[in-house]
Design a protein with these regions (language model features):
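Nucleotide-activated sugar donor-binding and catalytic core shared by glycosyltransferases
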Residues: 1-274
Length: 274
């Protein structure tokens, strides 16, 4: 990507190169590691397993600094007027729908979520809209359903939620750090999935499961990502007290719970150039 091109350019002019937040070469395009090895002085990673990957497998100078999400979420204040502000039903618990950040995946996932909504009349479902996607796009899929759409307030929406249906990505980690039980749901075209399976060598798609190296949150992928299966798993999730999931979330927080990732990184860079 763009950052790697900048790194290569800077190396030509003998600049010290420090890279904060590694490209996910451990997931795909591992060949990019060669550029990192040739051009970087130090790499600062935000996921605990990345240090071992880069250090032991590829002999890079690596520092694990914690995840910057933590610093942001610890500063978050609960909006006590959230329900009234968005005209939500104070008598019904909320289930958040996070169908992705790209139109193509939303078109694939959201109709499945809508089929699930109809099975849970005693709950209210709210879409956490991607910032770059207009409400009209969601409404074209939701149509006359009672699902509400909220922009630019995902964290407060999650805080007020009983559970969430989440498409894979950073959203799974955000949901876990806010201690909300979740199901991870993902579906793409057969061709895209076939190609991805050949390129991506991971046991899980959720960052929560990747970091803890076990299935803490249920992953419903491809043929398992259907209304029937999601309904079954969501019913079970809502019936449980979720103590086991919350306990695992605590472990997750301990693993990445450094709330000074950016400060630590800046200090390490400054110390290296003194």
């Amino acid at each position: 990507g763009f950052n790697l091109r900048i790194v290569k350019w800077a190396k030509k002019f003998s600049f010290n190169n420090h890279y904060y937040i590694s490209p996910q070469v451990w997931a795909w395009k591992e060949s990019r590691v060669k550029i990192l090895k040739e051009c970087l002085n130090n790499l600062y990673v935000i996921l605990p397993f990345e240090k071992k990957y880069f250090n032991e497998k590829h002999s890079l100078n690596v520092e694990y600094v914690g995840h910057p999400l933590v610093e942001h979420l610890l500063k978050l204040k609960k909006d006590t007027h959230f329900i009234e502000k968005y005209n939500l039903d104070g008598e019904k618990e909320i289930i958040t729908l996070m169908p992705g950040s790209r139109k193509q995946e939303i078109k694939k996932i959201l109709p499945i979520f809508i089929d699930v909504v109809n099975k849970f009349k005693s709950y209210q479902f709210v879409i956490a809209a991607a910032p770059s996607i207009e409400s009209e796009f969601y409404l074209s899929i939701v149509k006359n359903n009672s699902i509400k759409i909220i922009h630019n307030n995902t964290y407060n929406l999650l805080i007020h939620s009983k559970a969430a249906l989440v498409t894979s990505g950073t959203a799974t980690l955000e949901t876990a750090l806010l201690k909300i039980p979740q199901l991870v749901c993902y579906k793409t075209s057969f061709v895209s999935f076939f190609i991805a399976k050949r390129l991506v060598k991971l046991n899980y798609i959720s960052l929560v499961n990747l970091i803890l190296n076990k299935e803490v949150v249920k992953e419903l992928i491809q043929k398992n990502c259907n209304a029937k299966k999601i309904t079954e798993e969501l019913k079970e999730l809502l019936m449980r007290k979720n103590k086991s999931i919350l306990k695992e979330y605590e472990l997750l927080f301990k693993k990445i719970g450094n709330n000074k990732a950016s400060k630590i990184t800046s200090k390490l860079i400054i110390n290296s150039i003194k």
